[in-house]
Amino acid sequence: MRPLKLTMSAFGPYAGRMELDFETLGSSGLYLITGDTGAGKTTIFDAISFALFGEASGGNREPGMLRSKYADPTTPTEVTLTFRYAGKEYTITRNPEYQRPKGRGAGMTRQAANATLLLPEGDPVTKPKEVNMAIRELLGIDREQFAQVAMIAQGDFLSCCWRTPRTGRRFSGICSTPTSMWSFRTGSADRPTR
């Protein structure tokens, strides 16, 4: 699975709309996301994981915590991820449950959690549970497995490099090819760098 584009709206520390185009990073398939503490690195992982599985990348963040506390109340909270898998392109859009202003009158109302998966062929999958099942069937893994094989969390890079065959060395080529790595630097610039 290769991420192509990630769009976040009122998600985590991002009050507005933030778009990351992974295609600008090349086709090596290994991306390094760097930035200062609090710049939003983990939020990128959370957004990808939430789009795919309806859960943040870390077990301590509930979907209700994903709405930006800095967002305007009228800005919708959602994540859209376009990715390529087995040569086909998929787009998934998902929003957590959150409070938003009522359409009529004063006060707030609950925005229900929603998910839509656009398939390369055929009708879209439109209910969160059905999208979850479709993603699991497509990728063959759940969120926990995805977090272990597709994303190396902050602080876990060295432990992945030092794994032995006995402990399950899954990332054997990562430490040996640093020149093939591209990165997103999070923060004020938010531009891809090589």
Question: Where are each of the predicted segments found?
Answer:
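Extended, Lys/Glu-rich alpha-helical coiled-coil stalks
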Residues: 32-36, 50, 116, 126, ...
